[in-house]
Amino acid sequence: MSIEVKNLIKAFGKNTVIDDISFKVDNGEILAIVGFSGSGKSTVLKLISGLIEKDGGEIITTGDIAMVFQYSALIDSLNVFDNIPFALRERIDLRKKYAKEQVKNIVKEKLAMVGLSGIEKKFPSELSGGMQKRVSFARAIVTEPEIILYDEPTAGLDPMSSTLIENYIVRLKQETNAASIVVTHQMSTIMRTADKVLMLYGGKPVFFGTPDELCKQETPYTKQFVSADLEGPMKMIKE
């Protein structure tokens, strides 16, 4: 077990945004957390990563946690080579562990794992959105984490780039054996990457199961999410 969440609760003022959520993710598994906008998906990742504090429940993790942010969060003033080992320089325990030549080899290894060998000297502005995302993957795995959190990893990407990113999420799971959580609203990402799916609605769990089971659900929330139908419990503002 790498992640276990028990009865998780988070509120902002009087607004409870995460309401009694529980799940487990083992090593080598990918859990997709899905739902409509505002359902609390990204808040769960922020709670697990420690970016915000919970108001109730337990979060039990084993090993280092890495976060891949929605918009890559690369440092524009640094080239790829300097972006990737950022955690190795900032964490005192890791700074003392690796010599300069070792860091260089680690960067090359991680870039190769995401299919980007040879771009060390390029700056983020010189890369496509998909390439920036893959660099952020390389940065995430530089500390050999046991847990990888992906926040909307295909946001803003074209369909082919999205497929490539989805394939690398699965590949990194296989190569690192990390427990992974992918927050997404894309059915393609769910079907290509996830072993299990947790669906939230209004901060509450309304489904937990496999991607195939999600597609067969007839409950109003899950059915509308899968079909992208405008008719259902989730109402869109019409122009």
Tell where the protein language model's regions lie, with residue ranges.
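A short, surface-exposed alpha-helical micro-motif characterized by mixed small hydrophobic
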Residues: I190-R192
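Conserved catalytic motifs of ABC-family nucleotide-binding domains
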Residues: E144
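Conserved ABC ATPase "signature" region
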Residues: Y98-G118
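The feature captures the beta-strand-to-loop junction immediately N-terminal to the Walker
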Residues: V34-F36
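Catalytic Walker B motif of ABC-type/P-loop ATPase nucleotide-binding domains
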Residues: I148-D151
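Helix-to-loop junction immediately C-terminal to a conserved catalytic motif
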Residues: S49
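Conserved ABC ATPase signature
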Residues: F123-L127, M131
